[in-house]
Structure formats: structure tokens, C-alpha cells
Amino acid sequence: GFMSNQPVPNYVDADLQIVAGGITTNNAAVLEFDFITTGDSIQFRYVFGSEEYPEFVCSFNDAFGFFLSGPGITGPYSNNAENIAIVPGTTSTPVTIDNVNNGLNNNGNPNDPNCPPANPQYYIDNTGGTTIVFDGFTAVLEARHAVQCGETYHIKLAICDALDQAYDSG
């Protein structure tokens, strides 16, 4: 089986629009909460998976954002948030289909100059997988950021389809 066209309201998140490179996004799912820190940093481990892999790399750029806002944070997103779901070894490359993949796309050409591999060391091909439905997903990634102890911060986890409402990500 696979996940495609799940019936949900077509919510569009402005921050995900930016992460996806300004293209049309659909079916955003968002979880937000406030928390009080007990130390000087936070970290979360996560995996981004999608049915867009591998066929729709370089065309449907589903996106994920882990937006942190609070004292000392002055990012470009809502509430001055920063997206801390970034590709390891980069300072601002968001985790999306086009930014983590093995370079295969809808024509199946691994040497397409218009669709080179992007951070393939973090991509896991799962086509034909039986345990997890997504055809591809990232290795376990870590979102982290320095914070001020005892202060209240806000986190928003958001994911969306890009350009279509099919082949979901999660």
C-alpha cells in the first residue's frame, strides 16, 4: 500500500511556503506547543519520510519545518522563529524532498544534470519496503538549538505536500 490523497482540510502554512521555495503547498499538518526549558539547549530526533521518493524528486518538493521561537531567537519565520529542521552540515538548508535524495527522479535517470543527488548520505531508499509505507525517508536527523534556561519557547512542527495533494509525506 501507499499513502496518497488522504482526506484532510487544505490548510496552507505560510512558513512552509517559504521552506518549500515559494511553490504552492497543500494539506499542511501542524503541531504547536509551548515549553519551559530546563537547560541551555534543546534537541529532537526525527525522520522525514515521503511517498514522493524516488519518482518525484526535483518536481514535488514536499517540506518539513521545525520552527522554534522565543527569547534570543530572531529568525525569518512567524514569531521570529528559526527552522531547526536543517540538513546536517548546513546552516539553513531545510529538510525537503529536493534537499535530501539519491538523485533519482520521475525519469529514473540517476545522472540527470537537472536533478543531482542532494545529501544522499542522509537518504534511505525504501521502495518495496514492508514495515514503513513511505518509499524513502531520511536517516535519523537531529534538530538542536541553544536556549535560555527557565524561559518559555514555542515550537511548531509542520509538514506539507507541495504542488499537489497526492503522495503524502510524514
Region roles according to the model:
Residues 1-170:
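Aromatic (Trp/Tyr/Phe) and Gly/Pro-enriched flexible surface segments
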